[in-house]
Amino acid sequence: MDILKMIGRTEPLFNEDITNYRKELEELVTNNRFLVIGGAGSIGQAVTREIFKRNPIALHVVDISENNMVELVRDIRSTLGYIDGDFRTFSIDCGSDEYKALIRASEGYDYIFNLSALKHVRSEKDPYTLMRLIEVNILNTIKTIQLAKD
């Protein structure tokens, strides 16, 4: 099945940009420290792999799903190998005290990607799910911004 043909394209969406800006991307990533929150989810894994490929000084990945994190690390190790930088994963909730301790103990990050989210949830389902959705998708982002500033 030719997915590109199905969506009316001949090339993946960002191929040209990645090719044109390859040097700038590599310099930016190679010289910086990254934190990816929700890094074991579908989008998080793709972002983590792209950063990893460019050998950052540090790449720390946080995700609440230990199983998805194990799969991410196995996939990266089997396809991309290792980097010179500090690559670590943490199976913790980004709203937890452990997460706060991690951020406070870190050397800081140049870039933080918050890709954590409750998806596929009908927010009108019940008030408890709605409260959790607001906590994960909004309040944890606000807390991370505050922790990064401190």
Region spans (language model):
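Charged, amphipathic alpha-helical linker segments immediately N-terminal to NTP-binding catalytic cores
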Residues: 1-5
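A short, basic/flexible loop-to-alpha-helix module at the beginning of a structural domain
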Residues: 8-32
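N-terminal Rossmann NAD(P)H-binding glycine-rich loop of SDR-like oxidoreductase domains
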Residues: 33-54
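NAD(P)H-binding glycine-rich loop region in Rossmannoid oxidoreductase-like domains
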Residues: 50-61, 77-79, 83, 92-134
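Helix N-cap at the beta1-alpha1 junction of Rossmann-like dinucleotide-binding domains, i.e.
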Residues: 63-68
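Conserved SAM-binding loop
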Residues: 72-73
